[in-house]
């Protein structure tokens, strides 16, 4: 059997076979792994949130038991998810001066805010759908007159950032905090 040394015809033939026969299934498998990982991350964040709720419970009960005495001091405790600084973190990486769903300083910010407002942070599926929608908006131009035109994520990045860094940010959920 001949070795497929880099730069040889056999090497490039093997590369073409991989592209034709295997790449799409590898891509589908990688996307499935990514989706499962983000769902697991959401569950782990939910566990942290539930821990906060458990820790707040005795204090909340105390406040409820002494609400008459504390009426001059309105205290409310609850644990929930919030978007933490997502606009700054996202647009630190995205160039709003190039074609894409987030093109335009005000328009891009408004589009991201509208997407965030649709999310019910109490529901894991809603958070997962947000992540998928954000990815979709990077791949397809969702502005009204662009009819979902395909966009390259790399061209939407600011200098110094990679697609991997952007996806680590999006799928890492660092912007959702309990």
Cite the ranges covered by each PLM segment:
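Extended, charged coiled-coil "arm/hinge" scaffolds of SMC/Rad50-like chromosome-maintenance ATPases
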Residues: 1-177
